[in-house]
């Protein structure tokens, strides 16, 4: 005899409750690699419009961190979405492989850079970089990121280097490249110039001093011997002082105290008198700044004078209104000093940051060490009025984390002024996905100075410039193209082992070299010029990519980095931005919003998370945060994400178990929308709204909205209502009954569409779900397409069932109270009576068959008021009377001798 439990159509699936992700994910990765999934995706989409997300190259040094993981996963969401939604989207990952950090690693590991030829050291750098690429590539692939991993672009690749110097050549042709002596960021710790993008600001303690420069001019404007008081926080730059700047329109006041005469901005006198401890002072004459022009003051410790000059940048916010001017150590100082005043440029500091002979008695001292000795000398000579220490934001080398200086050295520059308006126009034409993105980049380009592109290092792409015998730099694009062809064949190392003649075209002559001798530039290019030309070295060079790219997506720090350098080089050569759209991500912080650091012990490693929880959890976390802002991650946050994942997985398991337990075949059993039961139509209508929203969110890269929308549907509409309601139909009704097939059609619609919509995000789990859908054709879910929008316009149906579900909420409240009062246990023990004074509600209730199934109770009557009033209805719950059916557990008036209600008896008799 068949047991009744065996007559129920219970869920059955091989899809396990536990994800076991750390063990399962490597199996999927192996499978995808063996089937060459990436190529198959591209083949499937051949002929479709191209969509190119161009990868900003991470630096090839060290393990990937959680910020790298977020970056690559966000890109993977987009590439997979585009490939499932009507595009062919090639994704070529890249690596930034030159630069100082790699040099430093080798030096720290005992490699003596100065004891070997440059070529040998460069080869060691290359070997190290390539090993780092292999290591990072393995880690990125573990995250489930799809792409052309076997053919990445590397900035050390000879073809990339050739394209890079071709960009340089085109910029030379347009007059955008020049060599000049200017104050630049200089890192003594790295012994190299730095670009703005290589600077970070940190708190730094500096001396704050007020110094008197004694007037030596005798023209009567101000009394001879008056001390012009300046303020500075960089005493080490005083040996480079050549001038004192005043504002032409400010009033300057003579102040007599203790037998000395001082000059200060009139507006600053009272504040400074208090600072200097002047109790009894007299005010002398007042003069305008422009009357002081060209006066000469004696330098406080060097045998020369400093010229008083006029400058509009002088302010009264701080200081004395008289500004220490060292054209070799400040941009404003340089500009005003090189104008009509011709002050010259003095920068008595060497590459290591030590003062030179031009600094007099302080020669040989490191700049920051010299501060205290200079201050002591000023105090001894009476030139020092006040000294204190201040903590302020100060630029540091972003790699060594040590303070940098402004220093004038001969450098190669890209002139921004030459095409700034074109750059700003290109920013205007770019689509941004955050309100602040456009003004941020626009203002940076508007306000930035010329770009110093030379570096005094070895590991990088050489600046392809030759010098004639007379010292003239030969800027000639035909020569640069000649070198580019050599680089293409032999790599840039050739620059370091061949002499200039071997690199020049045979028989080349130049008026500046009557003897036919030439030398090479030995500076290399800023690594931002490397990555900033990837639009040519990768996108324009590859047949499967396009220039400009559709999208660049990187961290928000790249507005001053890669977004910026790429824009400059691209507009310089073509007049257009290298990207049509820009998306930026915030930084990853710990659970309390603090930066991650090993010293704080708050670092979350993606490799560790992958081993413990699975990469899928990192992917879900990436899709659950608003990545456009700074985001947080911690072990507690990952536990919450894991719980969310568990619920998603359980929903998929329930759907699979009911659809594919042997009772349903989606190839033959699906019903059309018109054939569905009314409530099932309502669920399809609701779900299609979710699908439409999700598609819109994908189009705008709003991944946290995608997961929120789908998870809410799973938790609220499905788990809390529809699946609970449906158990009576799915388990109890006849296998091929209209009601059951109607509901299974809905479940299949939800499963087949939601698993596709989640495939770009939960790539491993979606594949596992798809494996358990037996009648699908594709080899992988990633070879299927997204569902199309299919909004159903049936406002009356939607309004009706929205209202009925509100009544259901009232019934659930009454059932919960009855449980608490021990009237009932399970809801099937309840008989429910409903009354409403809203005629619309009464009519709605009376229009629905089998209300007891909707409310998951044994019986429902709509009658006069006699219960607890809720929002829409009055509900009375009593314990149902009668007999419990042994199969469906509903309580009914009569059961047969086998304990079955009429419905179950009828089903089994069939």
Task: Give the residues covered by each predicted segment.
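Secondary-structure capping and boundary motifs in well-ordered enzyme cores
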Residues: 45, 49-55, 66-70, 74, ...
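Acidic, turn-prone loop/beta-hairpin segments
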Residues: 96, 184, 188, 194-200, ...
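Protease-associated
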Residues: 239, 243-244, 250-322, 331-335
